[in-house]
């Protein structure tokens, strides 16, 4: 049993190397591997999940589109958006997939509540919403009883690229961000708040901060 959690700050990164590192980490881990949260800000990219449909990518323009192995449909990542990847042994945590999704959604809801933002989850469409507007997207993959991929919380970003897609396959959905609701207006503030809430109800006895990707999981280009 490993009750250590590593919080890995990656800074700003292109999407594909981080995605491939997640896959490599998950493939190599065993029952003794510590869980990790990867905290990252991505260069502009559209990612199309396994349930995605081409018609939901309306006009990507100069932003690349990458087909990925997470659940869900198309979303946008870019500067000013908080992305956290959850590399967790959910069997060891005694979590089911739905429990993990609920925990992540509730983490964001509780974080926003600290700023008097009334957010909620929807059973029919994963993520976090304020009224009918979406502020946080969520997509996971489970392999060998372990999760990867994660959440994307809009903090202080250029929202225009969302108009080039039907976010999460939802036509007409409005995407919003925390800055415009008197919530966190910086990446670091949002990251600290979300991580605090996520870890508060889990039983990790040792939480370590690290920076950068471990080279064992970085594929040579």
From Swiss-Prot:
It is an enzyme of class 2 (transferase). It is found in: Cytoplasm. GO terms for cellular component: cytoplasm. One of its GO terms (molecular function) is lipoyl(octanoyl) transferase activity. The record marks 134 as: Lowers pKa of active site Cys. Pathway: Protein modification; protein lipoylation via endogenous pathway; protein N(6)-(lipoyl)lysine from octanoyl-[acyl-carrier-protein]: step 1/2. Residues 31-206 form the BPL/LPL catalytic domain. Its EC number is 2.3.1.181. Substrate binds at residues 70-77, 137-139, 150-152. In the reaction, the free carboxyl group of octanoic acid is attached via an amide linkage to the epsilon-amino group of a specific lysine residue of lipoyl domains of lipoate-dependent enzymes. This is Octanoyltransferase. It comes from Idiomarina loihiensis (strain ATCC BAA-735 / DSM 15497 / L2-TR). The lineage of its organism: Bacteria, Pseudomonadati, Pseudomonadota, Gammaproteobacteria, Alteromonadales.
């Amino acid at each position: 049993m490993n009750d250590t959690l590593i919080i890995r700050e990656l800074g700003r990164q292109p999407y594909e190397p981080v995605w491939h590192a997640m896959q490599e980490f998950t493939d190599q881990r065993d029952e003794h591997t510590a869980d990790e949260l990867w905290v990252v800000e991505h260069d502009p990219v559209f990612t199309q999940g396994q349930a995605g449909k081409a018609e939901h990518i309306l006009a990507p323009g100069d932003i690349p589109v990458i087909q990925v192995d997470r659940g869900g449909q198309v979303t946008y990542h870019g500067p000013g958006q908080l992305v956290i990847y959850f590399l967790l042994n959910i069997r060891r945590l005694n979590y089911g997939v739905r429990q993990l999704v609920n925990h992540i959604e509730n983490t964001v809801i509780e974080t926003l509540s600290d700023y008097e933002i009334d957010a909620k989850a929807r059973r029919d469409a994963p993520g976090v919403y304020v009224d009918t507007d979406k502020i946080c997207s969520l997509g996971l993959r489970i392999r060998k009883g372990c999760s990867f991929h994660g959440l994307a919380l809009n903090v202080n970003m250029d929202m225009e690229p969302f108009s080039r897609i039907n976010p999460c396959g939802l036509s007409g959905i409005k995407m919003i961000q925390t800055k415009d609701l008197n919530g966190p207006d910086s990446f670091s503030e949002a990251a600290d708040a979300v991580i605090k809430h996520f870890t508060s109800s889990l039983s990790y006895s040792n939480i370590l901060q690290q920076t950068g990707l471990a080279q064992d999981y970085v594929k040579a280009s």
